[in-house]
Amino acid sequence: ECLVGSEMCIRDRTRRSIFSAPDAVKYRGLTADRLKELGIDFVDITDVNDEGLLYDEAGRIKIAEKFKKEKIDGLFLPHCNFGTEFECARLAKELNVPVLLWGPLDERPDENGVRLRDTQCGLFATGKVLRRFRVPFTYMTNCRLNDPVFERGLRDFMAVCNVVKTFRNMRILQISTRPYEFWSTMCNEGELLEKFNIQLTPIPMPELTDEMKKAKAEGTEVAKVVKYCRQNMEICVKDNELE
């Protein structure tokens, strides 16, 4: 399973003459409803402020605390209008989880030249600041909530979150040493630990064979495993060979 922190973004709400804050609130609701419809397990921020949107530092601090408490696996940043790029970047940097950027398609301006949002430009701005913060992110193509690309992009992102979560908590069992001819299987144990916190647990072959002999002599555990294999797998060898 993957838990995603969904945090809708809006330009500073005090600048209502630039983009429509009410429409941003409306679209954040539509986006949350679509996530629920798709069965996405996400943490919302409706309790952070009245709009349930990120637009200032005070809100960012509360959101970070909540997402840390919930132990989210990924950060979804839907831009309901332009977005507050530096707050998005600060939050993503602090949480250190995979980040997904997305925004709806921009509508055409009305007869007075007024636009409800400028999501595309906002995504460019947020992406640029994220790169300056050295925060990797995934950009999902601007689309409507019911477009197939929206669901596919979310599913792909959740798969990435699961991979990253597993990778960060990985421990590798190394049985004996690498055979001389197997140069493709060599690894740098120190680099794995220093860069990725991945631990290797080496087991010498004599210790492994001794434990195998003890288990075979005792018999109980081996019998359970053989029975399980017979019940759940297609076995094409004899019992003594299976042992």
Ranges and model annotations:
Residues A32-G52, P136-N142, I198-I203:
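Short beta-strand elements in bilobed, periplasmic/extracellular small-molecule ligand-binding domains
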Residues E194, Q199-E218:
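Terminal amphipathic helices with adjacent charged low-complexity linkers/tails
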Residues F42-F67, D210-G219:
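N-terminal beta-loop-helix "entrance" segment that forms/cooperates
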Residues T14-G29, G113-Q120, E181-T185:
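Glycine- and acidic-residue-enriched helix-capping/strand-helix junction motifs
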Residues M8-C9, K224-E243:
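Active-site loops and adjacent core secondary-structure elements that bind or stabilize anionic groups
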Residues E1-G5, C9:
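Single conserved hydrophobic/aromatic residue that forms the stacking wall/gate
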Residues G52-R168, E181:
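Cofactor- and metal-binding active-site motifs of prokaryotic enzymes
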